[in-house]
C-alpha cells in the first residue's frame, strides 16, 4: 500500500468481480476503506458471463478447481439462506457427461479417480452402462464416459451476477461505469487506477477480475499474464417437443468432435 490508501479497486464487474466485492464485504474489508468496482459494460451485453453456458461441474483435472467448485455448489444449494427467499439462478442439477474415445480413456479414468478422491460424485461408465442410462446416446467410438450424478449442471450466470452485485451495493460497494486505461506505479506497487473518464482512483489493492481481458489489464501494469480471449460457440437446441429422457439430459461433452 505504497499510496497510503486502503481502498480496493476491482477491475471488472461481471460475476467474478461482483462475487469478489461481495465476499470482501463479508470479510469486513469495508471497515475504513472503499471498495470500488469498475465495469465498462454494466448491461452485460458483451461480457463473457452473459455469453457463457453457465456450466457448474466438479469434473476437473486439478484438485484446486474441484475444491473451488464445491464451495460454489454449496452456495447454489443454499442460495436463499444467503440472499433471501426470492433468490433464484435457475440451477439445474442435471449433471455433466464427458465422453472419451479410446485415445482419451486413460486420462478420463485418471481424472475420475482423482475427482472421487476429493469427494466428487462422479462415476465412470462403460459403453453398455451409458446406453442404459442415456437412451438417446450413441456410443459409437466411445470407450467410456464420466457422469457427475450430483453437484453438476448449469445456472443462469447473469442472475447470479445480479445477486452478488445487489448484495455488494447494499453493503456499501461503489460501482463505476468506466474503462481502466492504466495504472500509476510506485516501485512494484500500484498506487492508483486511471480511467477513460479522466478520473484517478487511489488504491491500496487492485483486483484483476477482467475475465478473458485479464491479460490486457495486467499488461497495463507491465505484467505478462497468459490470458487472452478466444472465440467459442454455444448452440441452443429447442427440445420442448423432445421425449422426457432427452429433456433431462446432462450437459454433454464429446472432445472427439462432431
What are these regions, as identified by a protein language model?
Residues 2-16, 36:
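Beta1/beta-strand and adjacent pyrophosphate-binding region of the FAD-binding site
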Residues 16, 43, 213:
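Conserved Rossmann-like nucleotide-cofactor binding loop
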Residues 19, 83, 183-189, 195-258:
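Flavin-dependent oxidoreductases
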Residues 22, 26, 162, 166, ...:
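Short, well-ordered alpha-helices that flank and scaffold nucleotide-derived cofactor binding pockets
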Residues 25-48:
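Glycine-rich FAD pyrophosphate-binding loop
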Residues 53-133, 257-258:
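Dinucleotide-binding Rossmann-like beta1-alpha1 core, especially the glycine-rich loop
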Residues 147-205, 213:
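Helical element adjacent to the flavin cofactor pocket in flavoenzyme catalytic cores
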Amino acid at each position: 500500500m505504497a499510496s497510503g490508501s486502503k481502498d480496493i479497486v476491482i477491475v471488472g464487474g461481471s460475476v467474478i468481480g461482483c462475487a469478489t466485492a461481495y465476499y470482501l464485504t463479508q470479510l469486513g474489508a469495508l471497515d475504513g476503506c472503499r471498495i470500488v468496482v469498475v465495469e465498462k459494460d454494466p448491461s452485460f451485453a458483451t461480457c463473457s458471463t452473459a455469453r457463457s453456458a453457465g456450466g457448474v461441474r466438479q469434473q476437473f483435472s486439478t484438485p484446486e478447481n474441484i475444491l473451488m467448485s464445491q464451495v460454489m455448489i454449496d452456495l447454489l444449494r443454499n442460495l436463499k439462506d444467503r440472499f433471501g427467499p426470492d433468490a433464484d439462478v435457475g440451477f439445474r442439477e442435471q449433471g455433466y457427461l464427458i465422453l472419451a474415445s479410446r485415445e482419451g480413456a486413460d486420462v478420463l479414468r485418471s481424472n475420475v479417480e482423482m475427482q472421487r478422491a476429493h469427494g466428487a460424485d462422479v462415476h465412470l461408465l462403460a459403453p453398455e452402462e451409458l446406453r442404459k442410462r442415456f437412451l438417446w446416446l450413441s456410443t459409437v467410438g466411445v470407450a467410456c464416459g464420466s457422469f457427475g450424478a450430483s453437484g453438476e449442471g448449469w445456472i443462469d450466470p447473469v442472475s447470479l451476477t445480479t445477486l452478488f452485485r445487489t448484495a455488494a451495493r447494499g453493503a456499501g460497494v461503489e460501482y463505476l461505469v468506466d474503462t481502466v486505461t492504466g495504472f500509476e506505479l510506485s516501485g512494484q506497487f500500484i498506487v492508483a487506477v486511471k480511467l477513460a473518464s479522466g478520473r484517478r482512483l487511489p488504491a491500496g489493492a487492485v483486483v484483476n477480475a477482467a475475465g478473458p481481458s485479464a491479460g490486457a489489464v495486467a499488461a497495463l501494469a507491465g505484467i505478462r499474464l497468459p490470458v487472452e480471449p478466444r472465440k467459442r460457440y454455444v448452440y441452443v437446441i429447442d427440445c420442448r417437443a423432445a421425449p422426457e429422457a432427452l429433456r433431462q439430459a446432462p450437459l454433454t461433452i464429446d472432445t472427439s468432435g462432431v
